[in-house]
Every structure is written in C-alpha cells, then in structure tokens.
Amino acid sequence: MEQYIKTISLQNQNLIIDYLNENILPHMIINPKGSAKGRRQLWIQTAPPLNSTAQWHVGYEDERIMNYVRSIAPEGFTPEAVLVTKGGNIKRHRDARYADYQGMSINLGKVTWYYERSNDQYFWQPNLYESVPAARYDLTGGEVFMFNTKNPHWVENAHPERWGINVWQISKNTRDEYEQFMQDRANGNLTEEQLDYKVAGY
C-alpha cells in the first residue's frame, strides 16, 4: 500500500456491514470467470470495461455508498467507479485500462493482501522491474488505504464474511470514453445491455 488513510472503528464497521448485507448482498452476482472466479461482487454507479471490446455499463445505484466513499477519499481523488465484494480471493493482477494509477481500498474483515511495489509513483515510469518481492499485509478489518492500481496485487485467505469496497477514478486514457458514456446515460441513450448492472469483472 502507498498511503494509509484511516482505521474505521469496529462500531462503524458493523453498521456498514449490516447495511451491505441488507441492501447490497441481494443484488450481487457470483463472478463466473476470470481472476476472481466465485467471488460475490457488485459494481456501484459505473461498471467500466475490463478489456478493449467490452462496453461501459451502469452500476447499481446506491448514493449512500457513494457519499461514504467520497467522504473518506483524500483530496484530489474522485470516486467514479466502485466495486463491492464479499468473500472470495483474486489472483495476481494489475487493474485494467479504465483505472487511474491511484486507487482506494476499504477492508471490512480478515484477508491477506499482497502488493508488489514496482512503481512507487502514480504515473508511468520506464525501465521498471517487472516483478519485485511482494509485501504481505494481514488485514483484520477497518483498514482504508491508497495503492497504485498498476502494481501487481492480489488477495488470499479471504474470510467468507469479509467485505471489500474498491474505489477508482477513471484514467486519462479512457476519460473521453467515460464522459461520452455519462453523457449518453444522462440523455437516455444507453443500450439495454449497458443498463444491466449485473455484469462480471475480474
């Protein structure tokens, strides 16, 4: 991790988890494929494309979650896509093209998080080592931190009741696509497929 933001109190963790179990869990899908196969998850607000042929989708609308992540995000970081997960691991990966270098993670439960800090800056640097020794973080719940989404990272030993809230702002490489999507969304010009928030990812 690059920057530790805060620790959420146990009381507030329980309030958040109760809300997620009641309001988010019924809408979640089980990821059928990819590096997080079998994990429960739900995109909030916007579901970005994970490859060059995929479309932008709307996410599930939950303003309470969006307001919360905005309230704890550091200055200069704008939450634009949020993925809520429950249980499940994810294999070593870098986040896709849509993701800006800086991302935020909110951990609510026991999990082991691995991170290879090959790039210590939030921008592209040439001639970096492709792989460096991974740092291991045994998280217990309440941790909020920033990390470089383009550095390899993964999750193991996730407790079945562990929740994660992962937050991105959109990269400059896909900013024009995102703004066009948001304009089409505001004007009611999205396809039926794009209006389906139950899409997989990772």
Predicted regions and their residues:
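Beta-strand elements of modular eukaryotic interaction domains
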Residues: 93-96, 104, 135-136, 156
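Short, conserved beta-strand element in jelly-roll/cupin
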Residues: 83-86, 96-113
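A short glycine-rich, His/Asp/Glu-containing loop-to-beta-strand
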Residues: 71-86
